[in-house]
Amino acid sequence: MKLGVISDSHDNLHKLEAGVSILCAHDLAMVVHAGDFIAPFTARYFASLPDLEIPFAGVFGNNDGEKFGLRKMFEPIGPIHEDKFEVELGGRRIIVVHKELLVEPLARSGDYDVVVYGHTHRIDVRTDPCLIVNPGEAGGWTTGKSTLAIVDLTDLSATIEEF
C-alpha cells in the first residue's frame, strides 16, 4: 500500500500538473498535500483523483490565506484540515502537518508510524524513531527542484521523485 505526498505547490501550475500526473500513475491508497496550495483554483489539478478512486486530504500551510475558497473548491476532491490530518492506512498511523515545529515530538510520541510535513521546501526522509517525510517542494520556486514522495506503507520507506 502506497501514499502519495506533495507539498508547497505555491501556485506553480505547470509543476503541479506534472506532479499530480506522476501521482496518478502510481497505485496509491491516498494522496496528501502538506500545505501551501495558495490559490483555490489549484483544486482543478487534483480533480482527476476522485475519478481514479484515490482519496485526497490536505492541511493548510502558512501561505494559504484564502481558506474558505480552498475548502469550497476542494470539497468534491477531499478535505483540507486546519492544522493536522490523521489517518490509518494499511494498519499504519499517519499524521500530516505543515510546519516542522512539532515533527520531532510527534515522531517520538509513539502514536504514529509516519509523520509527514512541508513548509521548509527541503527533502527530509528519516526512519528513526518512525518514518518522517518532507517531500520537498512541488512548486520548485525556492530550490529549483520540484519533488514529491511516494511512501510505501508496507516497509515504511519513501522514494522522492523529481519532476
Language-model regions: role of each:
Residues L23, L49, L106-D111, V125-D128:
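Alpha-helix C-terminal capping segments
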Residues H10-K15, I38-F41, N63-G69, L101-L106, ...:
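Active-site environment of divalent metal-dependent phosphoester hydrolases
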Residues E82-R122:
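Internal catalytic-core helix/loop-beta-alpha segment
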Residues L23-H26, D51, P76-P79, V114-G118, ...:
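Short, low-complexity, polar/charged sequence segments that are solvent-exposed and flexible
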